[in-house]
Amino acid sequence: MWTLQQPDLYAYAVHDGAKRTKIAAFDLDGTLISSKTRSKFPKNPDDWQLLPCAHKLKRLYELGYDLVVFTNQAHLGSGKIKASDLLYKLENIKKATGVPISFYVSPNKDEHRKPDTGMWREMAKQFTHIDKEQSFYVGDAAGRINLTTGQKDFSDSDRVFAKNLSLQFYTPEQFIQLDLDL
C-alpha cells in the first residue's frame, strides 16, 4: 500500500526487516526501466520497459536481499505528472519484476532527493539491522564522461548517494556483468 511518509516522500514498503539484512538498491529510470518510445521522459504511465538489470532481481531476492528502488521524480513535484499515474506505473513495474520490491519516491528538492540520504533513512526505520558491507546501490547517474563521444551522464547523484551511505556502487553496465552466484 502506498503511503505519504513525509509531506515530500511517497513509499511503497514491503520490507521483511526482521529477517533480511542485505539491501539491493536501485535507481529507477535508466537503471531498471527505460521509455518504450525512446523519449527522454515517458509519454504516459505505460511507456516503459524493463532493462537488463531488472532481470537479476529474482536471483537477488533468492539470495536474501531486500529489493528497494529510490527514485527522484521532479515531474511529480512540479505537477507535470499526476501521483496516481506514477503509482499506477510503479505497481505495474512491481508486477513485471515478479518479486517483492519497495519504492521510495522523492518528488521535490529536499533532504529526500538523491544524493541526499533522506529516502534511505526512512527505509532504514523498517529494519532491525542493515548489513551495509553486503548491501549495494545501482544507478545510471554516475558522472561518467564518454571519452569517445564527449557525452556526459546528466548527473552524478546516484554515485554520490551511494558514497554518502558508504555503499558499494555499480553502474547498470557493471551490475549486469556481476556473477551473483559467486
From Swiss-Prot:
Ranges that cross the membrane: none
Q: Which InterPro entries match?
A: HAD-like_sf, HAD-SF_hydro_IIIA, HAD_sf, PNK3P, Polynucleotide_phosphatase
SUPFAM superfamilies registered for this protein in UniProt: HAD-like
Q: Which Pfam families match?
A: PNK3P
The UniProt entry, under Gene3D superfamilies, shows: HAD superfamily/HAD-like
Q: Which GO terms describe its molecular function?
A: ATP-dependent polydeoxyribonucleotide 5'-hydroxyl-kinase activity; double-stranded DNA binding; polynucleotide 3'-phosphatase activity
GO terms, biological process: DNA repair
Protein family: Belongs to the DNA 3' phosphatase family.
Q: Name the chain's protein.
A: Uncharacterized 20.8 kDa protein in FGF-VUBI intergenic region
Q: Which organism is it from?
A: Autographa californica nuclear polyhedrosis virus (AcMNPV)
